[in-house]
C-alpha cells in the first residue's frame, strides 16, 4: 500500500495564486491463480481540493498474465487514471515552453482509460523481447486556444485554454539484455 499524505501546493500564474490540497491512497495485490494465470489488481483513490472545489476519484487498475510456455507470457491490462495538474505547452516561441497548471473550479481533471495487450519472450539467454499494443482515450485534455500562450496579457489564464478529447495508440517493441555480475 502506498500513501501520499495531504500536501499543500501553491501555484502562481499571471500574478494570481492558487492554493491546493491533495491526498492519495493506492493499494494493489498480486493473485496467483495457478502456474499459468496471474492477476494484479489495484485501486487508487485521489482527493484534490482547490478554490473550494473538491475532486474525488477512484482509479482501478487490472493486469492479467498468462504463462503460455516456459518462455512466452501473454499480458493484458486496463487502467483508469485522473490527473489534477496538466502540462500546457506552447510553440509560439523559438523554443518550446511548458507550464504546469492545476485544476480549478472551471478546469476539470483530465481522465483517461488505457488498454494494452502484449507478448513477452525470454527464450534466448540473458535476453527479453516484447511487443505491446496500447490504446488510450483521454477526456478534459487542456490546451491553449489558437493564437494564445502564457505570454502577453495578464488576464485570467483559464480564458486562454480549452478542454477537449484525445486518444493515443501505438505499438512498443523492446529488446533487453540482462547481465548478472
Give the ranges of each region predicted by the language model.
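Outer membrane beta-barrel strand-and-loop segments of large Gram-negative receptors
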Residues: 14-18, 24, 128-181
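Surface-exposed extracellular loop regions of Gram-negative outer-membrane beta-barrel proteins
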Residues: 17-52, 57-61, 70-115, 135-160, 175-181
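Hydrophobic, lipid-facing positions within transmembrane beta-strands of outer-membrane proteins
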Residues: 21-27, 43, 58-64, 113-117, ...
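Residue-level signature of outer-membrane beta-barrel architecture
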Residues: 30-31, 45, 56, 66-67, ...
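Repeated loop/turn-to-beta-strand initiation elements of outer-membrane beta-barrel proteins
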Residues: 36-39, 71-74, 125-129, 181
Amino acid at each position: 500500500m502506498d500513501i501520499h499524505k495531504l500536501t499543500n501546493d501553491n501555484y502562481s500564474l499571471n500574478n494570481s495564486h492558487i492554493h491546493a490540497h491533495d491526498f492519495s491512497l493506492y493499494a494493489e495485490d498480486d493473485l496467483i491463480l495457478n502456474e499459468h494465470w496471474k492477476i494484479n489488481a489495484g485501486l487508487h483513490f485521489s482527493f484534490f481540493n482547490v478554490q473550494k472545489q473538491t475532486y474525488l476519484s477512484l482509479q482501478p487498475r487490472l493486469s492479467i498474465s498468462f504463462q503460455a510456455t516456459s518462455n512466452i507470457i501473454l499480458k493484458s491490462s486496463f487502467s483508469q487514471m485522473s490527473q489534477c495538474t496538466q502540462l500546457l505547452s506552447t510553440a509560439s516561441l523559438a523554443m518550446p515552453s511548458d507550464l504546469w497548471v492545476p485544476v480549478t473550479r472551471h478546469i476539470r481533471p483530465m481522465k483517461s482509460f488505457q488498454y494494452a495487450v502484449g507478448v513477452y519472450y525470454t527464450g534466448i539467454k540473458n535476453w527479453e523481447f516484447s511487443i505491446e499494443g496500447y490504446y488510450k482515450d483521454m477526456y478534459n485534455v487542456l490546451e491553449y486556444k489558437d493564437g494564445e500562450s502564457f505570454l502577453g496579457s495578464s488576464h485570467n489564464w483559464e480564458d486562454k485554454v480549452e478542454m477537449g478529447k484525445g486518444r493515443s495508440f501505438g505499438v512498443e517493441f523492446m529488446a533487453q539484455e540482462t547481465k548478472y555480475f
